[in-house]
Amino acid sequence: MNVVILDTGCANLSSVKSAVARHGYTPVVSREAEIVLRADKLFLPGVGTAQAAMDQLRERELIDLIKACTQPVLGICLGMQLLGRRSEETRGVDLLNIIEQDVPKMTDFGLPLPHMGWNRVYPQAGNRLFQGIEDGAYFYFVHSYAMPVNPWTIAQCNYGEPFTAAVQKDNFFGVQFHPERSGAAGAQLLKNFLEM
């Protein structure tokens, strides 16, 4: 099976690569159109700011390539946010608009931002991405912006208020947490995605 990690220029690719390799796959890091489109599974990782990430995707001519994907795609952390319509970061950043939902800054409710550390995730019953993962399992988060709960939400988390921890629209999946840093639950989620 061809597993590709998209070289977005704004992610710690080695941790995702290692986590995938632990499941017996040999992922390829690439931004070449023919390799990406031939992938059976595609990872879209991202860290940092939405503006820097979108600039990198534009510069590397990856925006239309991502939108053309028909295989399962998993956005991780900022990679999930990039699937949205618009980030409220700085003066507003247009995103990939695969999921028609804006990504606002989280309200602090007296809690520290960024939201950093372990938190419980509550998936929709029966969702295949969370198969074999208990309701309320802990996952590791680092973020200050979050997609509100919306029609494409497949898992929620609460940090002062509910927000989208995972999303799905057609073949596009996204997780706000870092499965590669989330122990057994994260490993199971990656396994579920890889075996779809």
Swiss-Prot record:
HAMAP family for the chain: HisH (MF_00278)
Molecular functions per Gene Ontology: glutaminase activity; imidazoleglycerol-phosphate synthase activity; lyase activity
Reaction equations catalysed: 5-[(5-phospho-1-deoxy-D-ribulos-1-ylimino)methylamino]-1-(5-phospho-beta-D-ribosyl)imidazole-4-carboxamide + L-glutamine = D-erythro-1-(imidazol-4-yl)glycerol 3-phosphate + 5-amino-1-(5-phospho-beta-D-ribosyl)imidazole-4-carboxamide + L-glutamate + H(+); L-glutamine + H2O = L-glutamate + NH4(+)
UniProt subunit comment: Heterodimer of HisH and HisF.
A biological process term (GO) from this entry: L-histidine biosynthetic process
Domain Glutamine amidotransferase type-1 span(s) in chain numbering: 2-196
Listed Gene3D superfamilies: 3.40.50.880
Active site: 77 (nucleophile), 178, 180
Domain of life according to the entry: Bacteria
Keywords: Amino-acid biosynthesis, Cytoplasm, Glutamine amidotransferase, Histidine biosynthesis, Hydrolase, Lyase
Name of the protein described by the UniProt record: Imidazole glycerol phosphate synthase subunit HisH
Primary role: IGPS catalyzes the conversion of PRFAR and glutamine to IGP, AICAR and glutamate. The HisH subunit catalyzes the hydrolysis of glutamine to glutamate and ammonia as part of the synthesis of IGP and AICAR. The resulting ammonia molecule is channeled to the active site of HisF.
Compartments where located: Cytoplasm
Matches recorded under SUPFAM superfamilies: Class I glutamine amidotransferase-like
Entry GO CC: cytoplasm
